[in-house]
A protein has these predicted regions:
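Rossmann-like NAD(P)H-binding beta-loop-alpha module
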Residues: 2-69, 76, 80-81, 88
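Short coil/turn connectors at secondary-structure junctions
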Residues: 2-4, 28-33, 139-140, 162-163, ...
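Structured core elements
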Residues: 7, 33, 45, 127-128, ...
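Residues that cap or initiate secondary-structure elements
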Residues: 12, 134, 148-150, 173, ...
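Short beta-strand segments
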Residues: 36-39, 145, 168
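Substrate-binding/catalytic subdomain of NAD(P)-dependent oxidoreductase enzymes
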Residues: 49, 58-157, 162-164
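ATP-dependent carboxylate/acyl-activation modules
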Residues: 152-188
Length: 188
C-alpha cells in the first residue's frame, strides 16, 4: 500500500535467518545462485521415503500426524509454498521484483518409493529444491522441482523437517544456512 516491503525471517525457511543476509550482508557481493530446501513438510516426506522406503502417502500421513503437514497439504506437496519462497529469495538475491508466477513449479506427488530407491542406489537423494540463478544471458531463472543431488552435497544432509539455503556468490563463494523449517515454533 505504501510502497514499502516488509521482511519476516520466518517467511522463508522457518527459523533460518536468510532474508537479512541476502538483503544486507551480501548486498555488495554478486550472487550467482541460491538453492535450497525451503519446505519442511516435503523434506520430511522425502526423508522418510529415503530412510525407510515409505510410500508417499504413508510419509505424508506421518507428517500430518506430527503436525508438519496441514490437513490439506496441497500448497506444500505441489510446490506452491516453495515457489512463493523461491520468489522472495530470488528477489532479494538479484535485486528484482519476482512473483510466484515467475517460478516454474513442480511438486513431489509423482515421486514414488521406487524413484527414491533408484536414486539411493546411485548415491543420490531426491530433494524438492528451490533454485534461483542468473543465466548466461543475465536473466533470472527461478524454479522449484524435485532434484537429484549427490549425497556428498551439503544439501543432501538436510533431513526431516529441517531447511537449508545454499548460496553461491562471487566474493564469498559457497555458504549454507541451516535450521528448523516446519512446525509451530520455527515458523512463528
Amino acid at each position: 500500500k505504501g510502497g514499502v516491503d516488509l521482511y519476516y525471517e520466518a517467511a522463508v525457511a522457518g527459523a533460518i535467518p536468510i532474508l537479512r543476509p541476502l538483503r544486507e550482508s551480501l548486498v555488495g557481493d554478486h550472487i550467482q545462485r541460491v538453492m535450497g530446501i525451503v519446505n519442511g513438510t516435503t523434506n520430511f516426506i522425502l526423508t522418510k521415503m529415503d530412510e525407510s522406503g515409505a510410500a508417499f502417502g504413508d510419509a505424508l500421513a506421518e507428517a500430518q500426524a506430527l503436525g508438519f503437514a496441514e490437513a490439506d497439504p496441497t500448497a506444500d506437496v505441489e510446490g506452491f509454498d516453495a515457489a512463493a519462497k523461491a520468489a522472495i529469495l530470488a528477489g532479494l538475491a538479484f535485486h528484482s521484483r519476482v512473483t510466484d508466477s515467475d517460478v516454474y513449479r513442480e511438486g513431489i506427488t509423482k515421486i514414488t518409493a521406487t524413484d527414491v530407491a533408484v536414486a539411493k542406489s546411485l548415491d543420490l537423494v531426491v530433494k524438492l529444491l528451490a533454485i534461483a540463478e542468473l543465466t548466461n544471458e543475465g536473466k533470472i531463472s527461478v524454479r522449484v522441482h524435485p532434484t537429484l543431488i549427490s549425497r556428498s552435497h551439503p544439501l543432501a544432509s538436510v533431513r526431516e523437517s529441517f531447511n537449508a539455503v545454499f548460496v553461491e556468490s562471487e566474493a564469498a563463494g559457497a555458504m549454507m544456512f541451516y535450521g528448523r523449517g516446519a512446525g509451530g515454533a520455527p515458523t512463528a
